[in-house]
A protein has these predicted regions:
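N-terminal glycine-rich anion-binding loops that anchor highly charged ligand groups
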Residues: 31-46
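N-terminal amphipathic alpha-helix/helix-capping segment at the start of soluble metabolic enzymes
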Residues: 1-13, 69-72, 177, 239
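Hydrophobic faces of well-ordered beta-strands that scaffold small-molecule active sites
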Residues: 8-12, 36-38, 76-81, 105-107, ...
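Ordered, amphipathic secondary-structure segments that act as subunit-interaction surfaces
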Residues: 76-93
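Active-site-adjacent beta->alpha loops and helix N-cap segments on the catalytic face
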Residues: 1, 19, 42-70, 86-91, ...
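Extended, intrinsically disordered, low-complexity segments
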Residues: 230-239
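Glycine-enriched alpha-helix->loop->beta-strand junction motifs that scaffold or abut catalytic
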Residues: 32-33, 97-104, 124-132, 150-157, ...
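Catalytic cores of alpha/beta
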Residues: 19-30, 91-94, 139-151, 185, ...
Length: 239
């Protein structure tokens, strides 16, 4: 299942703030998003910002138990976790992902701290009928990006480390264009500081195929209509 281009995705942490509201959010977001990223709650969300970090700590369940409460697949769904939590249990993660209807598992720390597991990760994803996905940064070596493209990933996620609510710096637009050139036709997703249709439009115009909103969604997850309205407002930036 491919990601729509241009696309709007939503990130939510599994079972935050509780199972019932999480399941309601999955249903709502599946109707107004092009894809979902579902965070696997961890005690060490080291690459997440302060708001998302709190959702990991407050989630009703932790680890794969939190993922198992729902079934996905109405739209492409990507599980997002840290490979350090599952370094010796990659097959278990892939099995759970496949069983709940996910398309891929994204590990932001794979390339930065566990590059030696790259081949294991790709093989395991494929063995369970999943597509690999990769988290890259603007300083990821070009030769590595070129290698990743050859694995035919579901997408490349470009991390840009900006804070919600600040104006997008010009250098970030430049970084998107540079990575766009490197990944060629591979789907490029960017997620950072997305809280308005203007920011969505800017990121898409810079060369991303899709954007993900996470932090700006957190305080809206308990209200289905508010969540829906916000996502539809952001979708205006794709036009």
């Amino acid at each position: 299942m491919e990601i729509r281009k241009p696309g709007l995705g939503a990130y939510i942490t599994a079972t935050y703030p509780n199972k019932v509201l999480f399941l309601n959010a999955v249903k709502c977001l599946s109707e107004v998003s092009d894809f979902l990223e579902v965070g696997i709650p961890t005690l060490n969300p080291k690459y997440d910002g302060p708001v998302i970090r709190k959702t990991h700590f407050a989630a009703e369940l932790k680890g794969l138990d939190a993922i198992n409460v729902a079934r996905y697949g109405i739209i492409p769904t990507i599980l997002m976790g840290y490979i350090e939590d599952y370094a010796n249990r990659l097959e278990l993660v892939a099995q759970v992902a496949s069983e709940v209807g996910a398309s891929s598992v994204l590990f932001p720390d794979l390339l930065f701290e566990h590059i030696d597991r790259l081949e294991d990760y790709v093989v395991t994803m494929r063995n369970y009928g999943l597509r690999p996905s990769f988290f890259v940064a603007s300083n990821t070596p070009h030769r590595l990006v070129n290698l990743l493209v050859k694995y035919e990933p579901l997408f490349m996620y470009l991390g840009l480390y900006a804070a919600t609510g600040i104006k997008l710096p010009l250098y970030i637009e430049r970084n998107i264009r540079e990575v766009r050139r490197l990944v060629d036709g591979t789907t490029l997703v960017a997620g950072f500081a997305i809280n308005s249709p203007e920011m969505v439009r800017l990121v898409i115009n810079a060369g991303a195929d899709a954007v993900v909103v996470g932090t700006a969604l957190v305080d809206k997850l308990g209200n289905g209509e508010e969540c829906r309205r916000f996502m539809m407002e952001l979708r205006g930036g794709l036009a």
